[in-house]
């Protein structure tokens, strides 16, 4: 059984998909042992508590304190959050990490210590529309502006780059001529739920095979 930590910044609908799959499948190869958030108001933390899953808040303010957080650079905050997240994963003995709507770019030792054991969900068909600044609504706006005929989501391994790791799962949807960022998001969200579960299952089975 693979113990996973799920990192979430928002409402946690993809986290809920992972929770629901685990609870409804006795043969599920993963167990969510921890939910980590970099936002104190993330509803994902409530979802975790309702499911009896341990939570850790690793926002820059929580980690550094108000004064230091406000004075820190973007890279300093990213490293502080990443290091706190790594400590949380070690504390709860997480074998792997699933980024399910996580906004802070991870950096530092966590990338090396969990190499090949971190996957991320991205709301576009990588390698298109990835990299710095490409998250949430920004991605959907860019897809529509580029007049793409299709979009979707990608689950990929995390490396030291931004949205550059090897791809595990992709799900496609059509982009309609009258789409807005909101309508496109609504069409992609259900396939994100499918993709994140598929990605977690693939990760769990691969790591189990490697151990065997």
Over which residues does each language-model region extend?
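One-carbon transfer enzymes
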Residues: 1-212
């Amino acid at each position: 059984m693979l113990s996973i930590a799920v990192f979430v910044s928002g409402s946690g609908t993809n986290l809920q998909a992972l929770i629901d799959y685990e609870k409804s499948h006795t043969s599920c190869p993963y167990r969510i042992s921890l939910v980590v958030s970099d936002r104190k108001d993330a509803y994902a933390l409530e979802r975790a508590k309702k499911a009896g899953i341990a939570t850790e808040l690793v926002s820059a303010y929580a980690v550094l304190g108000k004064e230091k957080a406000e004075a820190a650079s973007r890279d300093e905050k990213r490293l502080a959050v990443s290091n706190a997240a790594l400590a949380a994963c070690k504390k709860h003995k997480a074998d792997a990490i699933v980024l399910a709507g996580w906004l802070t770019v991870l950096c530092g030792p966590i990338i090396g210590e969990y190499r090949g054991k971190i996957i991320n969900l991205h709301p576009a068909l990588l390698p298109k529309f990835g990299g710095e600044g490409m998250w949430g609504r920004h991605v959907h706006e860019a897809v529509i502006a580029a007049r793409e005929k299709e979009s979707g989501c990608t689950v990929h391994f995390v490396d030291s780059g931004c949205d550059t790791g090897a791809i595990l799962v992709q799900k496609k949807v059509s982009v309609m001529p009258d789409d807005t960022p909101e309508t496109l998001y609504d069409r992609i969200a259900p396939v994100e739920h499918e993709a994140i579960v598929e990605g977690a299952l693939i990760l769990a089975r691969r790591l189990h095979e490697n151990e065997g």
